[in-house]
Amino acid sequence: MNIRPANKDDDDFLKTMLYEAARWNPDWPREPIQEVLDEPIQRRYHEGWGRPGDGGVIAEMEGVPIGAVWYRLFTAEEPGYGFVDEKTPEVSVAVEPLHRRKGIGGTLLRAAMVQAREEGYRTLSLSVAVHNRSRMMYQRVGFEKVGEHGDSWTMLVNL
């Protein structure tokens, strides 16, 4: 497996990963990808990918992307689900279904944390449903609960 920085050419793959992240529960209906990506809150996570404050890493196997951790700065006027402040990028995490539960998400998270620190960020945030198994992975790499909204936690990690 190779891990590399995300770039503007990864836009389509990141949209696919955003769909996977947004529809993480296998019991939920699988709406068409474009229907999900067109939701106003989801558009905040992908429109104009590559703008200042965007970053992330991609996992590849034999040159084919299989997972991503990417982050974006949000504003108080248009926050993401895990918004903490305008200086803390919010992280999204997704791995292709066939490659899940193999440690790829944690490896990608740690790589993204290093990259974000090198870019001068001091913290990263995220939002996770309380019943999402990924919550335990986030805790293992250092994220801590800083808020709760309905059935989701806002988590933060110091870099």
Pin down the residues of each PLM region.
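A short beta-loop-alpha structural element at the N-terminal edge
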Residues: 2-16
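Conserved acetyl-CoA-binding loop-helix of GNAT-fold acetyltransferases
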Residues: 101-114, 118, 139-140
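Conserved GNAT acetyl-CoA-binding A-motif
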Residues: 116-129
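A short, internal acetyl-CoA/4′-phosphopantetheine-binding micro-motif in the GNAT/acyltransferase core
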Residues: 60, 90-101, 128
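Conserved acyl-donor/pantetheine-binding loop and adjacent beta-alpha core of acyl/acetyltransferases
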Residues: 52, 60-92
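Conserved GNAT-fold acetyl-CoA-binding loop/helix
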Residues: 22-46
